[in-house]
Amino acid sequence: VGMIAMMSMRPGIAIPAFQEAERLLASECRGTEWERMMARHFACYAQVASGDLDAGRRGAAQHVDEARRHNDTFALGMFMTTPRAWHWILEDDPAKAGPDFDEALRGWPTDEYYMVHHFEALSRGTVSLYQQRNEEALGIFLTMGQKLRAAMLTSLQALFAEYLFWLSRAAIRAGDVATAKRAARSLRRIKLRICEGYLEGLRGLEANRRGDGAAAERHLARAMEMCDEADFPLYGVGYRYRLGQQLGGASGERLIHQARDWLTRQGAKNPDRVLDMMAPGFDGVASQRLLP
């Protein structure tokens, strides 16, 4: 149930399923340490995806300590990547993430592309984007794309969609409109609710670029709703922030405050920086379209 929900990008359903799986494996089965570790990892991963960032990072920290005690290279590699990366983003201390990523890859072959390599690259690119090292982040994600295709992992639509979200954000930040368009074109072919919500957000950002305030408000409001409905409030809160900026005045300030408050309650020390990363594009060139 948990994996079906994850592959459908419904983290709200996946979280309790993975937690129950871990409980059953611990109480009813023997010799299932690997399966329990994977259930724990995907529960933390789904918590981050769903926007329960603080729970995801606290769970990852606990499992990192356990992996170190047991000298578990596989578990350490998994937990030191995506769940752990968000700890340093929330702490607004991204420079400390690099040693974690290096530790995650220690002992793994360098000429293969396993899941730990995927999660490490995704995490490293996300942290670079948070640091506003936009071209560096874009380079990481473009290299990831080549490896995903070589490993034939693009057929896993949830994994590929998440990659495309981050590729798109990095391309927008770096001013690579052609890559942003290619990412949007690929997302259109993935029929998942969160993909539709993300694309609706791009329509809002594009409308803002061309000065069409009414369209920007309409698309951003719809994107916010669609992302929340898809169990991705972390994406929705970015569009809430941008909608507030678009509206201005007292109503806009209220939305901006709500977005900041939501992230602050998740432990974010610099919520505006997270929000700008999640929904970039308001400072783009009006003549350049984001969508194909």
Located regions from the model:
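Active-site cavity-forming subdomains of large catalytic enzyme subunits
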Residues: V1-L25
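Acidic/serine-rich, low-complexity amphipathic helices located in mid- to C-terminal regulatory regions
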Residues: M3-M9, H41, Y45-G51
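Short, amphipathic alpha-helical segments
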Residues: S8-I15, R30-E33, S50, D54
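Active-site/ligand-binding-proximal alpha/beta "capping" segment
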Residues: F18, E33, A43
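Helix-coil-helix junctions within alpha-helical repeat/solenoid scaffolds
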Residues: Q19-E22, Y45-P292
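Aromatic- and glycine-enriched pocket-lining scaffold segments that form the walls
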Residues: R36-M38
